[in-house]
Regions:
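C-terminal peripheral helix-coil segments that are non-catalytic and often amphipathic
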Residues: 91-94, 98, 126-142, 146, ...
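Amphipathic alpha-helical segments used for helix-helix packing
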Residues: 97-119, 168-176
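Helix-turn-helix
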Residues: 8-11, 15, 19-53, 57
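A contiguous binding-surface segment within folded domains or other stable secondary-structure elements
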Residues: 107-137
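Hydrophobic alpha-helical connector segments
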Residues: 57, 71-104, 142, 150-157, ...
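Short, basic, alpha-helical segments at the C-terminal edge of helix-turn-helix-like DNA-binding modules
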Residues: 60-65
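N-terminal intrinsically disordered/low-complexity leader segments
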Residues: 1-7, 11, 18, 39, ...
Length: 214
């Protein structure tokens, strides 16, 4: 059985996602998107009434993928304590590695303010944010993780994973290595997990020694 060819609308979204990820909203031309898709610019407006509408669809589609993955991850067992925290961090790290377009879109939106207002994006993200913070608070009450500011910890975790990848060129220059090599990615993931394990798990040993220190 042959796979159905993607619709014109789907093709527009794929091309637009890459363009917006590479150049941001302001630096992206609808004419360039239409040209790459292979349609005339006016035809694009049959599918999306404006550049803002197209950008909004691209951004919300990207975050829908993120929400679906987090829902699946947080529903897995065991759904408590450090094992759940570790699973969420590993899943987030893998998603960001596999979806560099998402990383760049998120950074462009944060930098530009974007035509999707920050308030709207915050409204979309809030249920997942509150779910994560609520989980941590429940685990603190049960004594399975150390007491901390759960809401700020969720933001810190998101930033720790996202920033390493969004700032990869700078990170590479500072560390003197390719930050996206398999070894570097594994090292960074374990480093982040080590820090959060030390911060959250009662009685956990301190972070491991720095490379080259015995």
């Amino acid at each position: 059985m042959t796979t159905a060819a993607p619709s014109t609308r789907d093709t527009i979204l794929v091309v637009a996602r890459q363009r917006f990820a590479d150049r941001g909203f302001s630096g992206t031309s609808l004419a360039d998107i239409a040209d790459e898709v292979g349609i005339r610019p006016p035809s694009l407006f049959h599918h999306f009434p404006s550049k803002v509408a197209l950008y909004r669809a691209v951004l919300l589609d990207a975050f829908d993928d993120w929400f679906a993955l987090m829902d699946e991850t947080m529903a897995a067992e065991p759904a408590e304590g450090w094992p759940q925290v570790e699973r969420v961090i590993r899943t987030a790290f893998r998603f960001f590695v596999e979806r560099p377009d998402f990383v760049r879109l998120a950074r462009w939106e944060a930098l530009e303010g974007g035509p999707i207002l920050v308030e709207e994006l915050a409204t979309v993200l809030r249920p997942l944010f509150e779910r994560g913070a609520g989980f941590l608070e429940k685990e603190m009450d049960a004594g399975r993780v150390r007491r901390c500011d759960a809401r700020r910890l969720v933001i810190t975790g998101y930033g720790a994973v996202l920033s390493y990848l969004s700032d990869a060129p700078l990170v590479g220059s500072l560390l003197g290595e390719d930050p996206t090599s398999p070894v570097a990615l594994e090292t960074e993931q374990e480093h982040i997990l080590d820090l959060f394990r030390h911060a959250l798990v009662p009685g956990a040993p301190g972070p491991g020694p720095e490379p080259g220190v015995t």
